[in-house]
């Protein structure tokens, strides 16, 4: 009989097996199936007998076994079919199902409330990858469903039976592959799964569906949706089912599915499908699971956190996010006051908050709304010659002989530092200490909190044009062609460095060596302790205006249009960087990347290890006049110009992003003299030389929620 059933099943599979589509469990397909049930319920009851009669007719030609086993088996199948139909029509079963749905709805509301914050965080990241995956999934389902009807005869394509079964039937996947993990928010367990006895582990390969449930930590016994009494003969039919071979069981299941209504098929899908969604992460030790998640990009990690509660706990791991922050150069966690009480089991990650905040800040720099900046008015119509910005404190120096201390938060002038008898042309700041150099040939050390002048440093015989502060010492360069090393705590001059024959224009100090550039075309490297010149770097053919020093390389910019890279140990010139057409007025060096601004209105990005020009910031949006100041970080380059604009560029691509500041008087006298930027704020010193723009500071804040 088994072989005969197999032959009949093969025949049915050739004629009707391909009718089985692959209905999705999505909401659209569920509504479609429910609509079919509601509209055709009466018609299905009438067609039920016709379908059974048609199936019985196909088996008529099969030779029955002795003892009427064929008739008995057919009766049991009909009895079980009627039992599945009666379950869906049972009112008490529907009522219990409704109560269970209400209970799950309450649990879902609570879970949604817990995950609301995670959803908001994820929405801040680009969702294009998810959209493309959904499109690909939709296309794959469409191709699969289309291919399943290629070999159908014409009369079956047009039959009502085909229309009905393609909506309600699902072809079983008997392969060994496990379903891919879904994107839904489904709770998953984490434990060392054991068998129902609790004594021995489950087998590595589950042999029954109950074993599979046990392997998933859910127990072999499912919670039933109805309390109706089992039909007569059910246990005998199950015993007979267990006695059949694997192919015979598959054939019986196919026959059973053919006789089910859409709601019954839907129930089977809801029971079976989740068991093949194995959560491999929850089966791993926590340390190994975190190691796996560490390979995800931050935006993908936020998406993974929405998969289930256990994944969310893993995705909140503070050390995991600390590594992500380290990769992005974020060196401090973010400690904020929580408005919501965190439920047990969920630990807030300060490092994750810091990463999300930094992502929001970067987005605001790129495309956030440019709200009206804070305007800090001062120094009347004088030129702001130097600008410092540290923490929440801004210090501006002017040729009106004063310095002003401002709050970057409120925009208020906290105090005015009065004492110089000439214009202030250089300054440095660290913590609460401010140092200024003036045309009155002195340096002054100020207390930023009180405005008190702590020391006045005498020694230079001309304007103090440049200085560099390192810890407790400051090195000053003067138009008297000398450099002096000072102790800012005692006010004493420790060393005098003499050797230049013209005004010193720029200086750098790393605590061990002093590097100076002067109008005598020379760059000198000094040992301040012995007051000796270690190297004189010769090569420029005009005045040296700018310097950078990272402890290994010296980079000098000159009026001769060239930039030279030197080895500080040997004094050799490693590279000569050419491309600019005029004076290199400003440079910044970080991690072998040099950004130079020039009076020819261009900005260039260089690799000083190779001497290669990586990018030239120009094009239709380039500056229209000399570049006055610049600053860069790992993502952006910020430049200011005599044309009255401040521009933002992409460091890696060199592409223009947008204008951050555009003066109305730009092009007719309005100038941006200096800029200083932190991670979250931009400070610009603006004014004019012809009275068209009032002297002031502009403060833009990018650490705000632009939504």
UniProtKB/Swiss-Prot annotation:
Residues 87-129 have a biased composition (Acidic residues). One of its GO terms (cellular component) is Parkin-FBXW7-Cul1 ubiquitin ligase complex. SMART domains: FBOX (SM00256), WD40 (SM00320). Residues 278-324 form the F-box domain. Changing residue 349 to A: Does not affect interaction with PIN1. Changing residue 544 to G: In DEDHIL; no effect on protein abundance; changed on proteasome-mediated ubiquitin-dependent protein catabolic process. Residues 1-151 are annotated as: Disordered. Keywords: Biological rhythms, Chromosome, Cytoplasm, Disease variant, DNA damage, DNA repair, Host-virus interaction, Intellectual disability, Nucleus, Phosphoprotein, Repeat, Ubl conjugation, Ubl conjugation pathway, WD repeat. The modification Phosphothreonine is found at residue 205. Residues 69-84 have a biased composition (Polar residues). This is F-box/WD repeat-containing protein 7. It comes from Homo sapiens (Human).
């Amino acid at each position: 009989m088994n072989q005969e059933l197999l032959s009949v099943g093969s025949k049915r599979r050739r004629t009707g097996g391909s009718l089985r589509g692959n209905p999705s469990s999505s909401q659209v397909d569920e509504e479609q199936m429910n609509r079919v049930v509601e509209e055709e319920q009466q018609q299905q009851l009438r067609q039920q007998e016709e379908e059974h009669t048609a199936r019985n007719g196909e088996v008529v030609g099969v030779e029955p076994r002795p003892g009427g086993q064929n008739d008995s088996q057919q009766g049991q199948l009909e009895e079980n079919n009627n039992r599945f139909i009666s379950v869906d029509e049972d009112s008490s079963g529907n009522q219990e199902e409704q109560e269970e749905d209400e209970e799950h709805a309450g649990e879902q509301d609570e879970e949604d409330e817990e995950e609301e914050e995670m959803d908001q965080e994820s929405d801040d990241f680009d969702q294009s990858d998810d959209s493309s995956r959904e499109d690909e999934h939709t296309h794959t389902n469409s191709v699969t469903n289309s291919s399943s009807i290629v070999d159908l005869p014409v009369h079956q394509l047009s039959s009502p039976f085909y229309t009905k079964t393609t909506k309600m039937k699902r072809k079983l996947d008997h392969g060994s592959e496990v379903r891919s993990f879904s994107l839904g928010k489904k709770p998953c367990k984490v434990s060392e799964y054991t068998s129902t006895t609790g004594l021995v582990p489950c087998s590595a390969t589950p042999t029954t569906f109950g074993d599979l449930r046990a392997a998933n930590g859910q127990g072999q016994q499912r919670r039933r949706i109805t309390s109706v009494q089992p039909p007569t003969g059910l246990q005998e039919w199950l015993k007979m089912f267990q006695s059949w071979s694997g192919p015979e069981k598959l054939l019986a299941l196919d026959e059973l599915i053919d006789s089910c209504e859409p709601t019954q098929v839907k129930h089977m899908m809801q029971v079976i499908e989740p068991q093949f969604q194995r959560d491999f992460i929850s089966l791993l030790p926590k340390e190994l699971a975190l190691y796996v998640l560490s390979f995800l990009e931050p935006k993908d990690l936020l998406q993974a956190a929405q998969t289930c509660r256990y994944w969310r706990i893993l995705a909140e791991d503070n050390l995991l996010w600390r590594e992500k922050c380290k990769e992005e150069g974020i060196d401090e966690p973010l400690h904020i006051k929580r408005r919501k009480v965190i439920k047990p089991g969920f630990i807030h990650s300060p490092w994750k908050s810091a990463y999300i905040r930094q992502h929001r800040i970067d987005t605001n720099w790129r495309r956030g709304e440019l709200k009206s900046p804070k305007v800090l008015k001062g120094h009347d119509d004088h030129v702001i010659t130097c600008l410092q910005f540290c923490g929440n404190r801004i210090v501006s120096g002017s040729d009106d002989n004063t310095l002003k201390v401002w709050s970057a938060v409120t925009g208020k002038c906290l105090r005015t530092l009065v004492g110089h008898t000439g214009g202030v042309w250089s300054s440095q700041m660290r913590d609460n200490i401010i140092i200024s150099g003036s045309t009155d040939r002195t340096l002054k050390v100020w207390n930023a909190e009180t405005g008190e002048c702590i020391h006045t440093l005498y020694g230079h015989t001309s304007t103090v044009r440049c200085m560099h502060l390192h810890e407790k010492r400051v090195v000053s360069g003067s138009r008297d062609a000398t450099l002096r090393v000072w102790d800012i705590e005692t006010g004493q001059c420790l060393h005098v460095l003499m050797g230049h024959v013209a005004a010193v224009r720029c200086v750098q100090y790393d605590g061990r060596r002093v590097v100076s550039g002067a109008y005598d075309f020379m760059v000198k490297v000094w040992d301040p302790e012995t007051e000796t010149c270690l190297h004189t770097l010769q090569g420029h053919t005009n005045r040296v205006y700018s310097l950078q020093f990272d402890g290994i390389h010296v980079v000098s910019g000159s009026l001769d249009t060239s930039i030279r890279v030197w080895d500080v140990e040997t004094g050799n010139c490693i590279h000569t960087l050419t491309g600019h057409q005029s004076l290199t007025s400003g440079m910044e060096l970080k991690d072998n990347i040099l950004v130079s601004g020039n009076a020819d209105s261009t900005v260039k990005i260089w690799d000083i290890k190779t001497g290669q020009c990586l990018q030239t910031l120009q094009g239709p949006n380039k500056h229209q006049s000399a570049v006055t100041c610049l600053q860069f970080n790992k993502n952006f380059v910020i430049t200011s110009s005599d044309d009255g604009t401040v521009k933002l560029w992409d460091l890696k691509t060199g592409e223009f992003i947008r204008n951050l500041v555009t003066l109305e008087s730009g092009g007719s006298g309005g100038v941006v003299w200096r800029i200083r930027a932190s991670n979250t704020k931009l400070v610009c010193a603006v004014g004019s030389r012809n009275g068209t723009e009032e002297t002031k500071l502009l403060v833009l804040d990018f650490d705000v929620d632009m939504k």
